[in-house]
């Protein structure tokens, strides 16, 4: 965050944040409201939500949704972390892909026909068409997402400028901590759910406010969220579904329903299920997203009706600092998308999916807490934060 502000000299900082389920196809550790508090306490001025129809998607769709929201908010500059760290290399890579589009598409098809996943096929195709050191490594997850952010900016004819900060010492999927006080999201998650885990092991890797709010969430609600907590319901749901039912679920393609229904029979945990399910053709992340859609019962028709090929249909405001509130007041008339401070009275197919996702996310809570949290989510007004006193209002 501090590096972003230093690099961009920004007047205000806006974060677009996923809701209950994330791009890797897994539940967020804590609710979006707690994560909003974390962001505000760490210097973000406006926190807005990326709808489920974008947040649980491949990088291209995820980026399109995020950029459309930032564009609507009249953001002048975007900053993202990447393994490469040189913004010129991203633009060079986009230029090469555009010039070699026919060859690139042919190579992707060729590698997929050989049994590779789409992600692996695209990575291999890029290896074949990119020869200069001034191009990015498209096998790295943050490079891929950054590449799609810039493509979305160009596709949406936005005047937004892009900057990137090099990630170092820890990669996104690293499962262990290093001695440089930098940790991946994966390693932090693994530590939090390990036997006899405590927050002391991660305190040196995350901001103090984040550690405090994580501990507070666990104390107040008795849990942090991960896939294993949803597995019993997930397995029961699959055991009562036919292949025909499953085929209606978004991202269930090419006979995947038969493999899923076969492997669930002998799986006693989500991890063991995923280990038996993954293949060369389907990456872990791709399968986790499909499982998330099964869990939330999100169908192909629902996603189609939500118009995910278009831009985000609204902006759900989750939180704001005093500076962020001033920015919104000054620019509200220029912002073309509706800004939602709650969802109680607004209606849209995208929001229907969002409500289902929230219901599933809180399903692991005991009653009456579960019902209270669901009701509160629809009526919850944006969290306000006074950055001068470092207090929530």
Curated annotation (Swiss-Prot):
Gene Ontology biological process terms from the UniProt entry: tRNA modification
EC number assigned by the record: 6.3.4.-
Keyword annotations for this protein, in alphabetical order, are: ATP-binding, Cytoplasm, Ligase, Nucleotide-binding, RNA-binding, tRNA processing, tRNA-binding
Per the record, its GO cellular-component terms are:
cytoplasm
Tell whether Glycosyltransferase is among the UniProt keywords.
Answer: no
- Chain positions recorded as ATP binding sites: 81, 142, 167
- Which GO MF term does the entry hold, naming one? ligase activity, forming carbon-nitrogen bonds
Query: In which broad location class does this protein mainly occur, judging by the first location in its UniProt entry?
Result: cytoplasm
Query: What is this enzyme's catalytic activity, as reactions?
Result: cytidine(34) in elongator tRNA(Met) + acetate + ATP = N(4)-acetylcytidine(34) in elongator tRNA(Met) + AMP + diphosphate
Where located?
Cytoplasm
Quote the function comment for this protein.
Catalyzes the formation of N(4)-acetylcytidine (ac(4)C) at the wobble position of elongator tRNA(Met), using acetate and ATP as substrates. First activates an acetate ion to form acetyladenylate (Ac-AMP) and then transfers the acetyl group to tRNA to form ac(4)C34.
What family classification does the UniProt entry report for this protein?
Belongs to the TmcAL family.
This one is known as: tRNA(Met) cytidine acetate ligase
Task: State the organism named in the record.
Answer: Bacillus anthracis
């Amino acid at each position: 965050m501090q590096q972003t502000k230093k690099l961009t000299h920004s007047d205000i900082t806006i974060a677009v944040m996923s809701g209950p389920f994330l791009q890797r196809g897994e539940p967020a550790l804590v609710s979006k409201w707690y994560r909003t508090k974390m962001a505000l306490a760490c210097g973000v001025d406006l926190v807005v939500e990326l709808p489920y129809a974008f947040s649980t998607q491949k990088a291209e769709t995820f980026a399109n949704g995020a950029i459309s929201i930032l564009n609507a908010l009249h953001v002048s500059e975007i900053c993202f972390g990447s393994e490469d760290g040189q913004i010129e290399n991203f633009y060079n890579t986009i230029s090469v892909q555009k010039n070699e589009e026919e060859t690139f598409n042919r190579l992707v098809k060729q590698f997929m026909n050989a049994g590779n996943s789409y992600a692996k096929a695209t990575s291999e195709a890029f290896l074949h068409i990119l020869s200069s050191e001034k191009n990015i490594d498209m096998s790295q997850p943050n490079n891929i997402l950054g590449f799609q952010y810039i493509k979305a900016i160009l596709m949406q004819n936005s005047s937004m400028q892009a900057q990137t900060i090099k990630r170092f010492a820890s990669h996104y999927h690293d499962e262990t901590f290093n001695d440089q006080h930098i940790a991946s999201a994966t390693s932090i998650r693994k530590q939090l759910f390990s036997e006899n885990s405590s927050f002391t092991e991660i305190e040196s890797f995350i901001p103090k406010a984040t550690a405090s709010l994580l501990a507070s969430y666990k104390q107040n609600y008795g849990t942090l969220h991960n896939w294993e907590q949803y597995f019993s319901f997930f397995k029961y749901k699959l055991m009562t579904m036919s292949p025909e039912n499953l085929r209606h679920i978004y991202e269930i393609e090419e006979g995947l329903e038969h493999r899923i229904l076969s492997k669930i029979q002998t799986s006693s945990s989500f991890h063991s299920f995923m280990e038996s399910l993954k293949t060369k053709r389907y990456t872990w992340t791709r399968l986790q997203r499909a499982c998330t859609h099964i869990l939330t019962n999100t169908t192909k028709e629902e996603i189609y009706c939500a118009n995910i090929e278009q831009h985000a249909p609204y902006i759900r405001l989750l939180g704001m600092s005093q500076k962020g509130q001033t920015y919104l007041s000054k620019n509200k008339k220029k912002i073309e998308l509706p800004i939602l401070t709650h969802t109680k009275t607004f209606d849209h197919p995208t929001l229907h999916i969002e409500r289902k996702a929230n219901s599933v996310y809180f399903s692991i809570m005991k009653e009456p807490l579960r019902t209270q949290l669901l009701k509160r989510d629809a009526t919850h007004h944006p969290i306000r934060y006074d950055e001068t006193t470092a207090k929530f209002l």
